[in-house]
């Protein structure tokens, strides 16, 4: 079993939660193709800057219950940089835990092993849709308190 941190925005977090589907862009096809049934996905919501500032959150944990499949139906909201993106490479999910309130990701950074540069931590996530994390980081996250 593998553990994945999946990076999304607030709008697509709502889609993941409601439809129990995770999807990535074409350019991340090779990454999602490593995902197997039974793997755990931790949903990370990016921070929002400006006057509507929100910190980065851990929103929930899901188990993968399907093989990767391609579906170009428009259920996810595209990013402003790529307005035609449909995130077609997808897996179906089963909810393990949704954090209410969500967990502030910044509080976890000092303890997470996969983040080796604690000052420039966002570099470990930039440009990625998802990344594999160690089991001990997964356990730390799911046991965290908001």
UniProtKB/Swiss-Prot annotation:
Alphabetized Pfam families for the sequence: EVE (PF01878)
Gene3D superfamilies referenced in this protein's UniProt entry, alphabetically: ph1033 like domains (3.10.590.10)
NCBIfam families documented for this protein: PRK00809.1
Protein name in the entry: UPF0310 protein MJ1382
Disulfide bonds listed in the record: none
Family: Belongs to the UPF0310 family.
Annotated HAMAP family: UPF0310 (MF_00771)
Domain of life: Archaea
């Amino acid at each position: 079993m593998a553990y994945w941190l999946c990076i999304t925005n607030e709008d697509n977090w709502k889609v993941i939660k409601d439809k129990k589907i995770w999807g990535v862009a074409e350019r991340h096809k090779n990454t999602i193709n490593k995902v197997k049934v039974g793997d755990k996905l931790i949903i990370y919501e990016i921070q929002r800057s400006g006057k509507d500032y929100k910190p980065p959150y851990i929103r929930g944990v899901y188990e993968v219950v399907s093989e990767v499949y391609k579906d170009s139906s428009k259920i996810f909201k595209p990013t402003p940089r790529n307005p035609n993106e449909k995130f077609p490479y997808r897996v179906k999910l089963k909810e393990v835990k949704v954090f209410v309130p969500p967990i502030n990701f910044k509080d976890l950074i000092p303890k997470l092993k996969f983040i080796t540069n604690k000052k420039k931590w966002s570099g470990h996530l930039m440009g990625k849709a998802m990344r594999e994390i160690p089991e001990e980081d997964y356990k730390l996250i799911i046991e965290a308190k908001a």
